[in-house]
Each structure stands twice: as structure tokens, then as C-alpha cells.
Amino acid sequence: MSGRGKGGKGLGKGGAKRHRKVLRDNIQGITKPAIRRLARRGGVKRISGLIYEETRGVLKVFLENVIRDAVTYTEHAKRKTVTAMDVVYALKRQERTLYGFGG
């Protein structure tokens, strides 16, 4: 091995990085009907029009926190792939224990 670390294969200096599409406004992918279905599952009968944007905002903050913690676990384990267990541990750290995904 020539100083490439664990599993370092390949030749050259690393190669060009692929262009990644800039991610923005993806929160709009959480559609109004999807939010409605979640509310129905929670027993809600009528929904105010202002709820949809508020829900998207709250969901975005929640996911940012969980993903940040999950990525921290991944980096600490010197991996590049976030596993289901990383997410389970991240949720457990936030006192939102999730069962059924190993561990």
C-alpha cells in the first residue's frame, strides 16, 4: 500500500470529482397530500392552510439534526456509508429510540 489508507486501491492522483447537482428547495418534495396523510394517520380531521410550510420547516430541522448525528457516527467509525445503525444511534442520542432496525 502506498499511503492510501484502508482499502486504498486505484492509480493516479485521485481523478476528477463528478459534478454534483446543487440541492436546494428539495423540501418542497414533501407534498401537501403527503403531509395530509401523515396528519390523518395522527388522527387530524381538518388542516389549516398554514400548516404545510410550518410542517416542512419543522421536518427539515429534525432531519438536519438526525443526519448530522448519524454522519458523526459514520465518520468516527471511519466509514463513508451511513448505516441504519448510525441512524438508530443518532435517534437514541436524541431520546427518540427506534426499534426494529438491528442493535
UniProtKB/Swiss-Prot annotation:
Subunit structure: The nucleosome is a histone octamer containing two molecules each of H2A, H2B, H3 and H4 assembled in one H3-H4 heterotetramer and two H2A-H2B heterodimers. The octamer wraps approximately 147 bp of DNA.
Gene (UniProt): H4-VIII
Modified residues (Symmetric dimethylarginine): 4
Residues bearing PTM Phosphoserine: 2, 48
Entry PTM: Acetylation at Lys-6 (H4K5ac), Lys-9 (H4K8ac), Lys-13 (H4K12ac) and Lys-17 (H4K16ac) occurs in coding regions of the genome but not in heterochromatin.
Residue numbers bearing the Citrulline modification: 4
PANTHER family the record matches: HISTONE H4
Gene3D superfamilies in UniProt: Histone, subunit A (1.10.20.10)
Position(s), cross-link Glycyl lysine isopeptide (Lys-Gly) (interchain with G-Cter in UFM1): 32
Modified positions (N6-butyryllysine) in chain numbering: 6, 9, 13, 17, 32, 45, 78, 80, 92
Name of the molecule in the record: Histone H4 type VIII
Naturally occurring in which organism (per UniProt): Gallus gallus
Chain intervals for the UniProt region annotation (Disordered): 1-20
